[in-house]
């Protein structure tokens, strides 16, 4: 175990939209350290999202992310030999990273199209409140709702 909590690293905003959120998405999409390739994929996807939604790319992107961010999640806790799934509120930074992770995972799971197109389609679905990433969020919320009876075990 650590003596102290690890310090959060500052993420530099991206050069085009000047936004930290876009940089985080680029870092999530990046494979094997190929950042320039990841940047191309993300910027193309944001353009496609903007065209489809008829909104500025950052507005549409932020709405899509907010539609995927979970508010609650469950964590296992052992109480007297039984393991209960206990609902916890999700901190803002974790909610954001989970949302990005789910969107990228859902985009990668699609097949038969270029990655930028798959990412754009998943972002459009998230913007509209549909899609795999939004379904994942609803599943997590459903599990939290089911474990509501054990919420008093939080400590």
Swiss-Prot record:
Biological process, per Gene Ontology: translation
One GO CC term on file: small ribosomal subunit
Domain of life of the organism encoding this protein: Bacteria
Sections of the chain in a coiled coil: none
HAMAP family the UniProt entry points to: Ribosomal_uS7_B (MF_00480_B)
Binding partners and assembly: Part of the 30S ribosomal subunit. Contacts proteins S9 and S11.
Listed name of the protein: Small ribosomal subunit protein uS7
Lineage: Bacteria, Thermotogati, Thermotogota, Thermotogae, Kosmotogales
């Amino acid at each position: 175990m650590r003596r102290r909590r690890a310090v959060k690293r500052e993420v530099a905003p991206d050069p085009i939209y000047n936004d930290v959120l876009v940089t985080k998405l680029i870092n999530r999409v990046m494979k094997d350290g190929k950042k320039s390739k990841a940047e191309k994929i993300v910027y193309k996807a944001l353009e496609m999202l903007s065209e489809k939604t008829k909104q500025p790319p950052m507005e549409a992107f932020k709405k899509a992310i907010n539609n995927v961010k979970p508010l609650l999640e469950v964590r296992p806790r052992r109480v007297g030999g039984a393991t209960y799934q206990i609902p916890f509120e999700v901190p803002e930074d974790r909610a954001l990273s989970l949302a990005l992770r789910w969107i990228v995972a859902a985009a990668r799971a699609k097949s038969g199209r270029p990655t930028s197109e798959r990412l754009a389609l998943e972002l459009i679905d998230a913007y509209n409140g549909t899609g795999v990433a939004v379904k994942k969020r609803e599943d997590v919320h459903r599990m939290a709702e089911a474990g509501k009876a054990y919420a008093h075990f939080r400590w």
